[in-house]
């Protein structure tokens, strides 16, 4: 931010960039800079070596234009980071300020080597002003972030390390010394200036540098120049230290985040496909190196910001799972400890197992080569605690992919180790024998039509075989859960009233397989999908209405992996469309105060938030938005196959936690609603149980969106 003046005709002075003023042997800086740059490149190569150890296949070389745009939006615009108002914006200020200062330093270097006539006059004043202001915002940002971490101490930052403090101090020192240098230069310039115009240029170009200059006004010019030189070299030394430390500290996230933004999963929310499963020699992930390169990059990208932890329903109800610590950070520590032995085995051609017997490994306090990823590092409790709600992935500013890692480890536990909760084994058996996790005889799958008195409204394809526009995929809950059969009835009546042409497969419909897949039984999942695809294709299905959000996610996002490409809609999307088109006109607005629970699989997994709300408002519902709604919604506890697993209330660290569904129900009951409305059979079951546990059954009823709309139609 140093500029001088040269006289022009007419006596005017024009500001211009003067680099290296008052700095003898300034050229040495370019030689010294080779040291930190070399250290940085060495560190980057060591990171790359570790990522290349990955055995799993992850392909992220498609949609190049979209990836470049993602890199820009989330890296430079900080779109995901600023979701958290205070910390997010302070981080954005720090990033933008550092970025502009880095670019300015690069321009300085270029200006010093080649003539750059544009860095003078009004353009240069504007350039200097932008650098000065954004640099000061960065200084504010780092101070606020330090205050939050060390004085406010939010729970999400409960694993602060000593290195975090040193990094904050280093960044603070770089920024502060930069302004001291600028202030000293301006203070000296003021004393040496002969015109008010020159002083006016200084004030306009560097408002905060001018502020710092006021601190040094009483010093002599010689003292100013001496301190300017000393601080300049100190500033460059700590800046070079910063560069050298990047690959070896959490500063690495500056570059790792850019890679993660570029190579993030651009496909709709879906689990990873296992191709040629019958030929596979192993299933899932047993060792850290079995993951894909993007998974290992994820581990290096985590900055321990705690947003995943803050939003995780399992963590917030006292479970073993902490997506930040017991999952990502434990895996990262394990990878860091194991990588040297894996690299040595790769270099020598030795078997990985042999490295466990080396003297170096044996001398470790905990031999990383003998640690089990599933049992010692992550822990089976952590693996089974996850509800797949996607809150961690939704709020992670680095786009770390937590759920795929959990599911891969479950696959190994289930399909390779044969180690799973007994309730999961029972659900698998039920799905294998009767094609539904309830275990009710498959022959009665269409029985709900007669039970609810809507048989004549349904085109039962195996019997009627009429032409239809949509296939109604009712799912297991409508078929076998007594409470949810009423939802199926309401939906059928609404579709008929609107004149929608639809067919239903009855006993030729099978479980969607979502629970099987998310519990780790990929083979069973693919078997169920194959059976459904055969039925769909036999009847020429093109469009599908799905009742359950879990089935909706499977059919829409995951069935295409096996060739099942259809137009898939959740029923709330169809109802919202019918209401908007005037084909469903509620005649008896309810006028009821209600809270709405966002299903994780309809909301975070698929981005469907507004359509269910529009239906409820059309029905005359007074929808009260609670704090944890939409992207910030709290899981009911049944996702990820946990509908079929027992959950106990946890006593931990002297705190008695409630179950996930009870915790969520308490949130929904805060506004004292007359109704709690869901869009999912699992959610309805869990919230209804929560209302019962809260002894609020008399004052608050639990309904599904379809039921609410039908009530307003009757």
From Swiss-Prot:
Its cofactor is [4Fe-4S] cluster. Its main location: membrane. It is a multi-pass membrane protein. GO terms for biological process: butyrate metabolic process. InterPro entries: 4Fe4S_Fe-S-bd, 4Fe4S_Fe_S_CS, Cys_rich_dom, HdrC_iron-sulfur_subunit, Helical_ferredxn, NarG-like_domain, NarG-like_sf. [4Fe-4S] cluster 2 binds at residues 312, 386, 389, 392. [4Fe-4S] cluster 1 binds at residues 302, 305, 308, 396. One of its GO terms (cellular component) is plasma membrane. Gene3D superfamilies: Alpha-helical ferredoxin, Transmembrane di-heme cytochromes, Chain C. Residues 293-324, 375-405 form the 4Fe-4S ferredoxin-type domain. One of its GO terms (molecular function) is 4 iron, 4 sulfur cluster binding. Pathway: Lipid metabolism; butanoate metabolism. Induction: Highly expressed during syntrophic growth with butyrate (at protein level). Seems to be constitutively expressed. Binds 2 [4Fe-4S] clusters per subunit. Keywords: 4Fe-4S, Cell membrane, Fatty acid metabolism, Iron, Iron-sulfur, Lipid metabolism, Membrane, Metal-binding, Oxidoreductase, Repeat, Transmembrane, Transmembrane helix. It is found in: Cell membrane. The chain crosses the membrane at residues 25-45, 87-107, 125-145, 164-184, 207-227, 236-256. Oxidoreductase involved in syntrophic growth of S.wolfei with butyrate. Is presumed to link the electron flow from butyryl-CoA dehydrogenases to the membrane, in conjunction with the electron transfer flavoprotein EtfAB. May transfer electrons to the menaquinone pool of the membrane. Might constitute a membrane-associated complex with EtfA (Swol_0697), EtfB (Swol_0696), and the butyryl-CoA dehydrogenase Swol_1933 and/or Swol_2052. This is EtfAB:quinone oxidoreductase. It comes from Syntrophomonas wolfei subsp. wolfei (strain DSM 2245B / Goettingen).
């Amino acid at each position: 931010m140093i500029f001088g003046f040269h006289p022009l005709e007419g006596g005017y002075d024009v500001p211009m960039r003067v680099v290296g003023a008052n700095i003898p042997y300034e050229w040495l800086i370019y030689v010294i800079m080779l040291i930190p740059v070399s250290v940085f490149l060495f560190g980057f190569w060591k990171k790359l070596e570790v990522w290349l150890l990955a055995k799993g296949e992850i392909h992220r070389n498609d949609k190049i234009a979209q990836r470049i745009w993602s890199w820009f939006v989330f890296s430079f615009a900080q779109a995901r980071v600023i979701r958290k108002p205070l910390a997010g914006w302070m981080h954005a200020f720090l990033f933008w300020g550092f970025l502009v200062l880095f670019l300015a330093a690069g321009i300085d270097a270029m200006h010093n080597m080649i003539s750059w006539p544009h860095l003078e006059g009004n353009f240069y004043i504007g350039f200097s002003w932008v650098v000065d202001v954004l640099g000061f915002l960065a200084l504010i940002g780092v101070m606020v972030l330090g205050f939050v971490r060390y004085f406010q101490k939010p729970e999400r930052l409960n694993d602060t390390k000593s290195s975090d403090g040193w990094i904050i101090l280093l960044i603070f020192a770089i920024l502060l010394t930069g302004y001291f240098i600028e202030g000293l230069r301006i203070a000296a310039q003021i004393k040496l200036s002969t015109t008010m115009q020159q002083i006016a240029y200084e004030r306009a170009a560097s408002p905060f540098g001018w502020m710092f200059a006021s601190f040094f006004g009483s010093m002599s010019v010689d003292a100013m120049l001496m301190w300017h030189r000393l601080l300049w070299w100190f500033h460059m030394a700590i800046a070079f230290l910063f560069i050298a430390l990047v690959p070896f500290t959490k500063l690495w996230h500056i570059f790792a985040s850019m890679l993660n933004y570029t190579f993030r999963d651009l496909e709709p929310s879906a689990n990873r496909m296992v191709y040629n499963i019958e030929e596979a020699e192993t299933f899932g992930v047993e060792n850290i190196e079995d993951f894909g390169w993007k998974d290992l990059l994820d581990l290096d990208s985590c900055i321990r910001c705690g947003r995943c932890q803050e939003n995780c329903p399992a963590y917030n109800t006292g479970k073993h799972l902490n997506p930040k610590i017991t999952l990502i950070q434990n895996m990262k520590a394990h990878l860091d400890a194991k990588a040297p032995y894996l690299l040595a085995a790769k270099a020598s051609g030795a078997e990985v197992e042999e490295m466990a017997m080396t003297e170096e490994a044996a001398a470790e306090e905990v031999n990383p080569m003998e640690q089990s990823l599933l049992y010692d590092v992550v822990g089976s409790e952590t693996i089974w605690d996850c509800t797949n709600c996607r809150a961690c992935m939704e709020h992670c500013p680095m786009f770390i992919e937590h759920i795929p890692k959990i599911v891969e480890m479950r696959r190994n536990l289930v399909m390779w180790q044969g180690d799973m909760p007994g309730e999961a084994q029972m659900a698998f058996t039920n799905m294998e024998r009767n094609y539904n996790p309830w275990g009710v005889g498959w022959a009665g799958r269409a029985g709900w039509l007669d039970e609810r008195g809507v048989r004549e409204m349904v085109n039962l394809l195996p019997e009627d075989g009429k032409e239809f526009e949509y296939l109604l995929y009712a799912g297991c809950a409508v078929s076998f859960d007594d409470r949810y059969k009423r939802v199926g009835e309401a939906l059928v009546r609404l579709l008929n009233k609107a004149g929608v042409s639809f067919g239903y497969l009855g006993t030729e419909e099978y479980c969607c397989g979502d629970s099987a897949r998310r519990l780790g039984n990929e083979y069973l999942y693919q078997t169920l999908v194959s059976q459904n695809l055969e039925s769909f294709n036999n009847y020429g299905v093109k469009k599908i209405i799905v009742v359950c959000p879990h089935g909706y996610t499977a059919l829409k996002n995951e069935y295409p992996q096996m060739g099942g490409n259809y137009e898939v809609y959740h029923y709330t999307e169809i109802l919202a469309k019918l209401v908007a088109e005037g084909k469903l006109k509620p005649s008896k607005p309810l006028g009821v105060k209600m809270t709405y629970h966002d299903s994780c699989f309809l909301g975070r997994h698929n981005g469907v938030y507004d359509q269910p709300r529009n239906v409820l408002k059309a029905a005359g519902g007074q929808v009260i938005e609670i704090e944890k709604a939409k992207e910030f919604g709290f899981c009911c506890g049944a996702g990820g196959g946990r509908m079929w697993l027992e959950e106990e209330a946890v006593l931990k660290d002297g705190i008695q936690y409630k179950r996930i569904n009870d915790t969520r129900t308490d949130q929904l009951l805060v506004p004292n609603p007359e109704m709690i409305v869901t869009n999912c059979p699992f959610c309805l079951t869990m919230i209804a149980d929560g209302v019962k546990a809260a002894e609020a059954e008399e004052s608050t009823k639990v309904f599904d969106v379809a039921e609410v709309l039908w009530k307003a139609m009757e």
